[in-house]
Amino acid sequence: MTLKDNPPPFLHFRRFEALMQVPLLAILTAFIVAGILPNALGQLGNAELSIAVVPKGTDRERWNAIHQGALRASEELEREGVSIKILWKGDTATSRDKQIQVVDTFTGQRLSGILVASFDEDKFAGRIRIDRGSDLPMVYIDSGLDADRPISYVATDNFEGGAVAADRVGQLIEGVGNVILLRHQQGDSNAEAREAGFIERIKSSYPSIRMLSIDQYSGDSFSNANRVSEYLLNRYGRLVNAIFASSLQGTDGMLGALRDFDLAGQVFLVGHDASDTSLEAVRNGEIQGLLVTNPYKMGYLAVTTLVDHIQGGNMPTIVDTGITLVTMANIESDEVKEALGASSESL
């Protein structure tokens, strides 16, 4: 008996393997031609995306608007075939440490991406660098970070917003007079940018405007803002022609103080961010300018930007959501209604 008549077992296996390769290749080719295999492989890329959204807080309408914008984006993406889940987590207390704990919890999970509105730029960015080896993409909403990983910053140009406020003040007092800047609080990078933009524009464009005070802070409560505002009016009430309050709390607190001093409508007030109180004051002429952003649009664009990046698109460094100056003349316009979230369908 020869080797040809009775081959060893391993030769039988090799012949069987060679025979099997032909039909398998034919099957795969048929699947590709029929479009079955690409569709099957595509399903692997259609797993549900999990995107965490971490706001500065959960007890203010601004953050709820960001949440609603994010949900709107997820609903539209679902209709386009992108399965997506929004995980919303914040704290009612305005605590930097608690926010970092929330982000730490999320970064330890299997997420597709994360959206963050940070409290403290320096402190938060330092914490993020510890985890910079992670490939978790992040988009920063409302405030930016000097972080190392690829990110996008979806927010308003706050420096430009401060310049817009300065121009409104300059227009109101015709380029001549005394003004007060009521700051928000130290560590708030958004407010600090607005304040810097205001000061720079006054100095560069309005040489006949004198800044009486630029070192007082309203803080994060109406009561403190009102107290500081009364101090400023006690000291400068007979001299001041116009005031810029760089925060929601400062605007409402200063408005209350102007009313108490019978100066509302006589001393011009330009504020930032909208409340029912401040909007009514615009209508009745007690506030002559109100800078408003569009948090709904921020949430919407943050999600769509992040998903585009996850799907292979280029993530822009900055997505500017714009700022609107609200006055008595335009408060009922569609532009203002959209910025205030009253006409979100126009997105």
Model-derived features: positions:
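Short, low-complexity disordered leader/linker segments with a strong preference
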Residues: 1-49, 130-134, 343-344
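An alpha-beta-alpha
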Residues: 51, 70, 164-206, 212-216, ...
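Hinge/beta->alpha junction and helix N-cap segments in small-molecule ligand-binding domains
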Residues: 55-67, 86-98, 120, 154-164, ...
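Signal peptide-proximal N-terminal region
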Residues: 68-86, 203-208
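Hydrophobic alpha-helical
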Residues: 114-132, 198, 218-280
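Flexible loop/hinge segments that line or gate small-molecule binding clefts
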Residues: 122-160, 178, 275-283, 287-288
